[in-house]
Amino acid sequence: LTVTKDLKVSVKAPVGCPQKTIDDFVLSHEKWINEHIEKQKSRLSLEKTLDEKRVSELRALAAAELPRRVEYYSEKMGLYPASVKITSAATRFGSCSGKNSICFSYRLMLYPPEAVDYVVVHELAHIKEKNHSARFYALVERYMPDYREREKLLKKTPKL
């Protein structure tokens, strides 16, 4: 179940799944669907608000700041990425590849430094734990005991 960028609801179901089962599933997830439609609307609004100059400024800030934050937390955690890149990703703040390359969206710079540091620690933790298991979150918590509060900051619409 997903909500696309153009605000359409997409449902994937096994071949042969009865239409009634699909309809019932969608109806039972109406609240979730409405919440995610609103999130997509916020993202679309943000996209329209960011002009080229502001995007350029955010990219420059990300390129200057994020490698420094990665270096700082890499030393603390003993986890070192193969590379650090800045992207234009709109639906995720960061990612860590199977080869331990870390990418961060320049949009992360719209959030408070505490939230930025959480994303850095989160992605570095993926170097050791490639999933979101209990061990992964224990590792994140070891280096950032208040990560849950920091994570909540990312759920709010950023200040432009």
What kind of region is each of these model predictions?
Residues 1-118, 127-160:
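Active-site-proximal or metal-binding-adjacent scaffold patches in catalytic folds
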Residues 123:
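Walker B catalytic acidic pair
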